[in-house]
């Protein structure tokens, strides 16, 4: 499943083909005892150069397709690498336990933290169970319960965002999807404890915002963050979903653009090839960033943190007319 999905991305085909050639040469060298060391070294050097060139020139839409891949690490892939000890907690205490939004308590370095995050599936069956990472009202209420627990016991909060958006089915609307997200926004501004939000893959619309209010917003290098998917934006503005490439460019969904615009605070580097190419290295880089930001935030008084958090989000949306260089 994962390989077939990767092959559907044209920009990855040269990399996958070269990786296949390296695998075949390695097998020949191993099983036929043929010395191919120089050839293998040469191919691996070519692969490193090719990966660098491809991933340095990704378009916004290519980044979106990349983070939608099944092998992209999810919240529950990162947690065992980041936390030395952790325990998943369940339920919103209202009869729901949404598997699309997970959370728990864990140990990050010397900090006891509460974490919540969207959870996508790894295959068709898992994606159906996880609703493709689209959380229901019960999921956001579960997240709120855990974050209130963190605030009560003075535990920092870490959120991990990776969703195409909140679930928009009739049942979700009946159960108060908009209200659940709105309450989370209000409450997250009021919490005294440090909050760090990290966009792991796809940060989509209100589904992302439901756990996206924090003192620091981190974003993985190839992740995207958008008010609407490029496909939806193209359909709304131009009545043509095929113009998703134009929409992706206009929406400024990449980490570099959002850093310039002040929507996020820090871009977290990924291994060449994306976090899916080396999950453990990607997790290590993210862990170091989280520890550094937590160390800074814990030095501030709660009132100072809340004021800075409020001011940060009040500034988002400021724009400058007639400044083409600013918007790229």
Swiss-Prot record:
It catalyses: N(6)-carboxybiotinyl-L-lysyl-[protein] + acetyl-CoA = N(6)-biotinyl-L-lysyl-[protein] + malonyl-CoA. One of its GO terms (cellular component) is chloroplast. Residues 42-296 form the CoA carboxyltransferase C-terminal domain. PROSITE patterns: COA_CT_CTER. GO terms for biological process: fatty acid biosynthetic process; malonyl-CoA biosynthetic process. Its EC number is 2.1.3.15. Pathway: Lipid metabolism; malonyl-CoA biosynthesis; malonyl-CoA from acetyl-CoA: step 1/1. Gene3D superfamilies: 2-enoyl-CoA Hydratase, Chain A, domain 1. The keyword Plastid applies. It is found in: Plastid, Chloroplast. GO terms for molecular function: acetyl-CoA carboxylase activity; ATP binding; carboxyl- or carbamoyltransferase activity. InterPro entries: Acetyl_CoA_COase_a_su (IPR001095), ClpP/crotonase-like_dom_sf (IPR029045), COA_CT_C (IPR011763). Pfam families: ACCA. It comes from the Eukaryota. Keywords: ATP-binding, Chloroplast, Fatty acid biosynthesis, Fatty acid metabolism, Lipid biosynthesis, Lipid metabolism, Nucleotide-binding, Plastid, Transferase. Its main location: plastid. Belongs to the AccA family. Component of the acetyl coenzyme A carboxylase (ACC) complex. First, biotin carboxylase catalyzes the carboxylation of biotin on its carrier protein (BCCP) and then the CO(2) group is transferred by the carboxyltransferase to acetyl-CoA to form malonyl-CoA. Acetyl-CoA carboxylase is a heterohexamer composed of biotin carboxyl carrier protein (accB), biotin carboxylase (accC) and two subunits each of ACCase subunit alpha (accA) and ACCase subunit beta (accD). This is Acetyl-coenzyme A carboxylase carboxyl transferase subunit alpha. It comes from Gracilaria tenuistipitata var. liui (Red alga).
């Amino acid at each position: 499943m994962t390989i077939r999905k990767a092959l559907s991305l044209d920009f990855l085909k040269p990399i996958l083909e070269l990786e296949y050639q390296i695998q075949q040469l390695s097998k020949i060298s191993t099983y036929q005892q043929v010395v191919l060391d120089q050839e293998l070294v040469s191919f691996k050097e070519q692969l490193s150069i090719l990966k660098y060139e491809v991933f340095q020139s990704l378009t916004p839409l290519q980044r979106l397709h990349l983070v939608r891949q099944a092998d992209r690490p999810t919240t529950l892939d990162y947690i065992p690498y980041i936390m030395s000890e952790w325990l998943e907690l369940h339920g919103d205490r209202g009869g729901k336990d949404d598997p699309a939004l997970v959370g728990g308590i864990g140990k990050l370095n010397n900090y006891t933290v509460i974490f919540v995050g969207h959870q996508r599936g790894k295959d068709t069956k898992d994606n159906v169970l996880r609703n493709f990472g689209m959380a229901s009202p019960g999921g956001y209420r579960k997240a709120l319960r855990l974050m209130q627990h963190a605030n009560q016991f003075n535990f920092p909060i870490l959120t991990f965002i990776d969703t195409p958006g909140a679930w928009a089915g009739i049942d979700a609307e009946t159960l108060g999807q908009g209200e659940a997200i709105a309450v989370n926004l209000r409450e997250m501004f009021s919490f005294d404890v440090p909050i760090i939000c990290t966009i792991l893959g796809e940060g989509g619309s209100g589904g992302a915002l439901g756990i996206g209010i924090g003192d620091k917003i981190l974003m993985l290098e190839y992740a995207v963050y958008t008010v609407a998917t490029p496909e939806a934006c193209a359909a709304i503005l131009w009545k043509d979903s095929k113009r998703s490439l134009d929409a992706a460019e206009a929406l400024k969904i990449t980490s570099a653009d959002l850093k310039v615009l002040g929507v996020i605070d820090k871009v977290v580097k990924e291994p060449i090839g994306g976090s899916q190419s080396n999950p453990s290295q990607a997790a290590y880089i993210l862990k170091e960033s989280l520890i550094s930001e937590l160390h800074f935030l814990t030095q501030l008084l709660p009132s100072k943190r809340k004021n800075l958090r409020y001011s940060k989000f009040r500034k988002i949306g400021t724009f400058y007319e007639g400044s083409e260089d600013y918007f790229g």
